[in-house]
């Protein structure tokens, strides 16, 4: 971050970002076809989320022990929490799919997933740049994250319009509305990561 040598906070943030990247990769590529694969999908994403929670616990412990941090303690914590929100959102999506017994995707879910996958790639790049103290190089990637989030906003409106205009089963309307909103919230969490990174740039560049 501010120092040339990677400190323990940079290393922990990188581990968190790598876990998000791996989670998003699995999230996009795993194909749910029946109840068995749906359970496997939800269970695996829960494992990724638990791994992320463990990273957060270590980060908080290290922050509490540290006398000096490379950037403001509160900024590290906010960034950590926003990263964790991305993982929590993905796990929540899989839990909703399992609760609703939805064993197939649709074009809107696929598009949301693609944007979230791209956000995860950009998040990993930004955290690695932060760890290398290349603050000025972060901005273009933060902008990309915000662009993907904006695309998800538009997709959210489009998906709801299609849902309310074409679905006649009221139960499915309720279920898919919650699914789409959960996906849009994941994108919002990605944008929060970008916002926190921009705050760090502003304070330290």
From Swiss-Prot:
It holds the Pfam family PhoU_div. Belongs to the UPF0111 family. Disruption phenotype: Non-essential, it can be disrupted. InterPro entries: PhoU-like_sf (IPR038078), Put_Phosphate_transp_reg (IPR018445), UPF0111_domain (IPR052912). PANTHER family: UPF0111 PROTEIN YKAA. Coiled coil: none annotated. The gene is ykaA. This is UPF0111 protein YkaA.
């Amino acid at each position: 971050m501010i120092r040339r040598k990677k400190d323990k906070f940079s290393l922990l943030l990188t581990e968190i970002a790598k876990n998000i990247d791996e989670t998003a990769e699995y999230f996009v590529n795993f194909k749910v076809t029946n109840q068995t694969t749906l359970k496997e999908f939800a269970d695996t994403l829960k494992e990724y989320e638990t791994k992320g929670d463990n990273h957060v616990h270590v980060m908080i412990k290290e922050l509490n022990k540290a006398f000096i941090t490379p950037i403001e303690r509160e900024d590290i914590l906010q960034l950590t929490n926003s990263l964790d929100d991305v993982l929590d959102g993905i796990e929540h999506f899989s839990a909703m799919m399992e609760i609703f017994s939805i064993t197939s995707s649709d074009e809107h879910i696929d598009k949301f997933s693609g944007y979230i996958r791209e956000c995860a790639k950009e998040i990993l790049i930004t955290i690695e740049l932060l760890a290398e103290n290349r603050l000025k190089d972060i901005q273009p990637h933060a902008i990309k994250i915000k662009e993907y989030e904006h695309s998800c906003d538009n997709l959210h409106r489009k998906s709801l319009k299609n849902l309310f205009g074409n679905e006649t089963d009221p139960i499915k309307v309720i279920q898919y509305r919650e699914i789409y909103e959960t996906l849009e919230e994941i994108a919002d969490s990605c944008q929060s990561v970008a916002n926190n990174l921009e705050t760090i740039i502003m304070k330290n560049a």
